[in-house]
C-alpha cells in the first residue's frame, strides 16, 4: 500500500483555496437579505472586468463590499440586534442564510471548473453541447460482445445529514464553519435517528436545493473517488474522465488525475483485482450505471464491493436488491431519455449446394436506441399539450400571444425534441410527438380565434404547419475539429445533437 500512498493524501491546494464563509463576517448577511441576489451572484463575481479569476478570498470580499455599497437600504447590525434579526421568521432567515452559505462555498468549485476548461481549451460557454453517433459510454463495439452486464446502482439517498456534514471535514479544517453548517441542519432535521425519514430529507432538499446539492455532491465525490481508485488498480489502462454536466448545479468537473481516496481497512482485499477490466461508469439522477464485458463472477465481486462500501464507509445498510444486473440483449437501459439495447436478430439465409439446400440461421447484434413513448406522453401531458392518453389539447396560457409567437413557441419545442432524439434508431415515437405538438398548436390558434381547428386550418392553409413535419438538418458542433468529423464518419453513424441548455424547455414552460 506504500506505493499508492500518493492517492491517499488529500489535495492540500483545495484546502488552501477554500473560502471560509466566516471570513466575510457581516457581508454574508447582506447577501442573504436580498434573496433574489443569490441567483446572479456567481455571474457578478466572475464577470467583473479587471479581476483575474484566481481563488483569492480578498478579491471575493472586495466584490461583496462593492455590492454592499450599491444597496444603501440594507442596514443590519448583527452585533447589536442579533435576536431581532431572527424574531420575525426564523425558518425563512435560516433558509436564506443557508443559501448564502452555499453560494460562497460554491466559489472555489466554480473556479476549479473554469480552470479545468481552460486547460482543455474548450469554450466554457459551449461546453454543454456535444455530438456523437451514440452516447460516449456506449461508443465501444458492444455488438461484438457475447454478454454485456449492466449494473444499475441506486446511490444511498435517505441517509443521516450528519454523515454528509462529516464528509466536509476532509476539505474544511475550520471548526467554526462546520458548526455553522450543523446549525443549518438542526433547523430542519431530527437528529435522534440514524436514518432520516423520506419526508424530512425531501423537505430539506426542496427548501434548500442549492445547499443540499453541495452536501450531496461532496458525498458522491468521495464515493466515486474510491471507485475510480479501485478501477484504476484493476485495469492496465488508466481511465480517462470526461466532464459531462446535466445541470449547472452539479459543479463537479471530473478531470483526469483528480483522485482523492479515503479507503477503509475492510477494502484492502478488493485490490486483488488483476484482470484487464473493460468498464464504464456513468452517474445520472441518483443512480450509477456501470457496464463491462467482464464475466459474471467479476461483476458479482463488484456488487459485493458496492454493498460493503455502503455499510462500512457510509454506515448505510444496503439491500442487494438495490443493485440491478441485466444484459442489454435482454433488458434495455433507460438513460437520458433513451432506451438502449442490443437485441439479437435472426436472419435466414438459403444456401444451395449441388442438389441439397440448407437454411442457415445467422444471429446478428445491433445497438438500438429507442425513444420511450410513455415518458414522452407524460411530459407533454404535464406541460398541458395533451391529456394522459396522448390526445392533443390546446394551450390556454398561450392564447393571448400573437399567432406568430404561438407558432414559434411550438416550433422551438418541436425542433429541440427532434434534434435531441434524432439519434434514435426508430423514429415512430418522434413522429407521434411532432403530431401531438402540431395539433396542439392548431387547437391553441383555434381557441384564440374562437373557431374550430378544421375551419381555422382551411382559412390559414396547411403550409404554415409544414415546418413541424420537415426533416431536421444535421447540426455540427464547433467544439470538435474538422478532422474529427470526416464526411465518411457522418454517413456511417447516427448524429446526435445534445444541447443541454435548451432541451429542458418542455419541462420549464408554464
UniProtKB/Swiss-Prot annotation:
Keywords: Chloroplast, mRNA processing, Plastid, RNA-binding, tRNA processing. PANTHER family: MATURASE K. Usually encoded in the trnK tRNA gene intron. Probably assists in splicing its own and other chloroplast group II introns. Pfam families: Intron_maturas2 (PF01348), MatK_N (PF01824). It comes from Memecylon elaeagni. It comes from the Eukaryota. GO terms for cellular component: chloroplast. Belongs to the intron maturase 2 family. MatK subfamily. The gene is matK. One of its GO terms (molecular function) is RNA binding. This is Maturase K. One of its GO terms (biological process) is tRNA processing. It is found in: Plastid, Chloroplast. InterPro entries: Domain_X, Maturase_MatK, Maturase_MatK_N.
Amino acid at each position: 500500500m506504500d506505493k499508492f500512498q500518493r492517492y491517499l493524501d488529500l489535495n492540500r491546494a483545495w484546502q488552501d483555496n477554500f473560502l471560509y464563509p466566516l471570513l466575510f463576517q457581516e457581508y454574508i448577511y447582506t447577501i442573504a437579505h436580498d434573496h433574489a441576489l443569490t441567483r446572479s451572484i456567481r455571474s457578478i463575481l466572475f464577470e467583473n472586468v479587471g479581476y483575474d479569476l484566481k481563488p483569492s478570498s480578498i478579491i471575493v470580499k472586495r466584490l461583496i463590499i462593492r455590492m454592499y455599497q450599491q444597496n444603501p437600504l440594507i442596514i443590519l447590525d448583527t452585533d447589536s440586534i442579533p435576536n431581532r434579526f431572527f424574531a420575525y421568521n426564523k425558518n425563512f432567515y435560516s433558509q436564506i442564510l443557508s443559501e448564502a452559505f452555499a453560494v460562497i462555498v460554491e466559489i472555489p468549485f466554480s473556479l476549479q471548473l473554469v480552470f479545468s476548461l481552460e486547460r482543455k481549451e474548450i469554450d466554457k460557454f459551449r461546453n454543454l453541447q456535444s455530438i456523437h453517433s451514440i452516447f460516449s459510454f456506449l461508443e465501444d463495439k458492444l455488438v461484438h460482445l457475447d454478454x454485456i452486464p449492466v449494473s444499475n446502482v441506486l446511490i444511498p439517498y435517505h441517509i443521516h445529514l450528519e454523515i454528509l456534514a462529516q464528509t466536509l471535514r476532509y476539505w474544511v479544517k475550520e471548526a467554526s464553519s462546520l458548526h455553522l453548517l450543523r446549525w443549518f441542519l438542526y433547523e430542519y432535521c431530527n437528529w435522534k435517528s440514524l436514518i432520516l425519514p423520506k419526508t424530512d430529507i425531501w423537505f430539506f432538499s426542496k427548501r434548500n436545493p442549492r445547499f443540499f446539492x453541495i452536501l450531496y455532491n461532496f458525498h458522491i465525490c468521495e464515493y466515486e473517488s474510491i471507485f475510480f481508485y479501485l478501477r484504476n488498480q484493476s485495469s492496465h489502462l488508466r481511465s480517462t474522465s470526461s466532464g459531462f454536466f446535466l445541470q449547472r448545479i452539479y459543479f463537479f468537473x471530473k478531470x483526469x488525475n483528480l483522485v482523492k481516496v479515503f479507503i477503509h481497512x475492510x477494502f484492502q482485499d478488493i485490490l486483488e483485482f488483476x484482470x484487464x477490466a473493460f468498464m464504464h461508469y456513468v452517474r445520472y439522477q441518483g443512480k450509477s450505471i456501470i457496464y463491462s464485458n467482464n464475466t459474471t463472477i467479476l461483476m458479482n465481486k463488484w456488487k459485493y464491493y458496492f454493498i460493503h462500501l455502503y455499510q462500512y464507509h457510509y454506515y448505510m445498510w444496503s439491500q442487494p436488491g438495490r443493485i440491478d444486473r441485466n444484459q442489454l440483449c435482454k433488458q434495455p437501459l433507460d438513460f437520458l431519455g433513451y432506451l438502449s439495447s442490443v437485441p439479437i436478430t435472426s436472419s435466414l439465409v438459403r444456401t444451395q449446394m449441388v442438389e441439397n439446400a440448407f437454411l442457415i440461421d445467422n444471429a446478428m447484434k445491433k445497438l438500438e436506441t429507442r425513444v420511450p413513448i410513455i415518458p414522452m406522453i407524460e411530459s407533454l401531458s404535464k406541460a398541458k399539450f395533451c391529456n394522459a392518453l396522448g390526445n392533443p389539447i390546446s394551450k390556454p396560457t398561450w392564447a393571448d400571444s400573437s399567432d406568430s409567437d404561438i407558432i414559434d413557441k411550438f416550433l422551438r419545442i418541436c425542433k429541440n425534441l427532434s434534434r435531441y432524439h434524432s439519434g434514435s434508431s426508430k423514429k415512430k415515437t418522434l413522429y407521434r410527438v411532432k403530431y401531438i405538438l402540431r395539433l396542439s398548436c392548431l387547437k391553441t390558434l383555434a381557441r384564440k380565434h374562437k373557431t374550430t381547428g378544421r375551419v381555422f386550418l382551411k382559412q390559414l392553409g396547411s403550409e404554415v404547419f409544414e415546418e413541424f413535419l420537415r426533416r431536421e438538418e444535421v447540426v455540427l458542433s464547433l467544439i470538435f475539429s474538422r478532422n474529427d468529423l470526416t464526411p465518411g464518419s457522418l454517413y456511417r453513424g447516427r448524429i446526435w445533437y445534445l444541447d443541454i441548455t435548451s432541451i429542458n424547455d418542455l419541462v420549464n414552460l408554464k
